[in-house]
Amino acid sequence: MSAPKPRIAAPNASLAGHLLDQYAGRIARSRRPYIIGVSGLQGSGKSTLAREMKVQAEGRGWPTEVLSLDDFYYSRSDRELMAQQIHPLLRTRGVPGTHEIELLLSVLAALPQASDKLHVAWPHFDKGRDTRMPPSRWPRVTRPPKLVIVEGWALGIRPQPQVALDEPVNRLEREEDADGSWRHWVNKQLRGYQPLWRKFDALIVLQAPNWDVVRRWRGETEEELLARHAPLAMDAASMERFLQHFERLSRHALATLPALADSVVEYDDDRHMTGLTHS
């Protein structure tokens, strides 16, 4: 029986600094914006880490932008149309196929040319209203960044083998996707995400222990929202159904992403960091 891994006292500030140290030489040498993907399942702290990395990177003199995959969701009205034309489960944002990936790619292509004459803007998604903010409230830059951080859930994930789609993984799939058409469609959409993954110069994966822990982390977040009476906060039953949309690909990500990552940050059940490896 192997000895348990020691906990590493590394809050976001020191973790962000270590990760920037790891890629500093490559960032400095790059003639175009260096792009880092930060991938983590719900509740893993990817957004917080990305923000801290931006603060520290700019402190080192590197103009930095953070793009969130969540900001590129299609609007509620667009997803309603998808639900009518393709599958009802596409009303719920989150799975591959509910992001406007071509727009994100166009933003990445435009950022090196950003200037006072060429402003580069990208969407900001209002999760409370389940739609995009008006363009007047979108982030806008007028200088080319040295570093771009793209953060999101399951960045880098590859499509599952077709045979893996045969059996449902939960009640949602058994009852609302009995013929498998939704999960096959979502898996097919992942092919369109691969050009984005290939833009990453480095991929950092925040690795949770297992799917049950991810469910608990996300549930804790929702409990906090309910306590604050936040709009669209979900009760336990609604939360469980919502998470079932992501269970299949979350389990796939937990099993496959570490082998595809340049850096893996491992966490225990309580979000304490237990390991950091670089390939």
Where are these regions (language model features)?
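Phosphate-binding/switch loop-helix module in NTP-utilizing enzymes
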Residues: V107-I157
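Conserved lysine of the Walker
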Residues: K46
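Extreme N-terminal, non-catalytic leader segments
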Residues: M1-I36, L41
